[in-house]
Regions:
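Hydrophobic alpha-helical segments, chiefly the membrane-spanning helices
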Residues: 1-331
């Protein structure tokens, strides 16, 4: 009886943690079937691989972050929305690059990659500048979306990483071979649109409950659990690519994902609800985000190969960052 009474307070936390994991599974599954359905639709209508790469694939891989951020903002949890984006950008560099290079090294000397990293770095600086205004409002959201439009326009003019474009062509070709019927395509699209919001609601609601129960801020939940969970699709994809010895494409995907997170996800979310910026973000987390962006930019400019030793350092850096967040929040 005594043991049962001791375990009772933790049961709610275990249930919430389980619901968060279920939510992540729904987000990952929903994003995957949404991309598959959209690719199949594009293949049937012979849509340009370039257009598919810039829209369908980019939106699909960032769908978990987008839906979680929108739902967080609507429900009054702006810290989770912004923490999700900032934390995902940090995890993308330290974790999503750090893990696969333990399996196979990643080359940074790729056509057009230096220009993409420059855009990511400039976008990061501009994004942090907007955060220091204290609130991301509709006006700032429009500015971010205008930046996204410029980025996509530049990509449409041919400033697209060639290896990434070839990967999209391969995906389109693979889907086209199956000659899927319209009803199956619509089933995939509909399933993705249903699973994503359900998964997002589980993650946001249960994550908020955990923050209250553990006595830590919603910002920390957004930066850690939520950001890590929404980055799982990118991590799984890069690890799979590493086993195929094709990790070079993953680097361009990480850079593109970080740009998309700041411009599209925050931009769209700000159109729906104003995002108040927690002071904790400005004192520590945005500087970590800028530091890892600068590291990646420098690595690409030097044309160095990111190998196992550097991967270990990246993972240690991510571990220290998470440790600092959790211990700082609990103290």
């Amino acid at each position: 009886m005594d043991m049962a009474s001791e375990l009772t307070p933790y049961m709610g936390d275990l249930i919430d943690l389980g619901l968060v994991l279920v939510g992540f599974a729904l987000l990952i599954g929903g994003g995957d079937v949404l991309v598959r359905g959209a690719l199949a639709l594009a293949a049937r209508h012979h849509v340009s691989p370039l257009l598919v790469g810039m829209t369908v694939v980019a939106m699909g891989t960032s769908a978990p972050e987008l839906v979680v951020s929108i739902l967080s903002a609507i429900s009054g949890h702006a810290d989770i929305a912004l923490g999700n984006v900032i934390g995902s950008n940090i995890a993308n560099v330290l974790l999503v690059i750090g893990v696969p290079v333990l399996i196979y090294p990643m080359a940074t000397a790729q056509p057009g990659l230096a220009r993409q990293t420059n855009i990511m770095m400039l976008t990061s600086i501009a994004f942090v500048g907007l955060l220091f205004l204290g609130t991301i409002s509709t006006l700032q959201g429009l500015i971010l979306l205008a930046g996204l439009g410029m980025f996509l326009f530049g990509a449409a003019r041919g400033d697209v990483e060639l290896s990434a474009l070839e990967e999209v062509k391969a995906q389109l070709g693979e889907v086209a071979m199956h000659h899927l019927s319209y009803w199956r395509i619509l089933l995939w699209l509909g399933l993705g649109m249903v699973l994503l919001p359900i998964g997002a609601e589980l993650v946001v609601d249960s994550g908020t409950n955990l923050a209250l129960s553990w006595g830590i801020s919603e910002a920390v939940i957004g930066l850690t659990i939520v950001a890590l969970g929404t980055s799982l699709p990118e991590l799984a994809a890069t690890v799979a690519a590493a086993f195929r010895r094709n990790v070079d494409v993953a680097l361009g995907n990480v850079i593109g994902s970080n740009i998309f997170n700041m411009l599209a996800i925050v931009g769209i979310t700000a159109l729906i609800a104003d995002l108040d910026v927690a002071p904790a973000f400005l004192s520590y987390d945005v500087w970590v985000m800028l530091a890892v962006a600068l590291f990646l930019t420098a690595a690409v400019w030097r044309g160095r190969v990111i190998g196992r030793r550097l991967g270990i350092l990246l993972l240690i850096g991510y571990g220290l960052y998470i440790y600092h967040l959790v211990t700082g929040s609990l103290s």
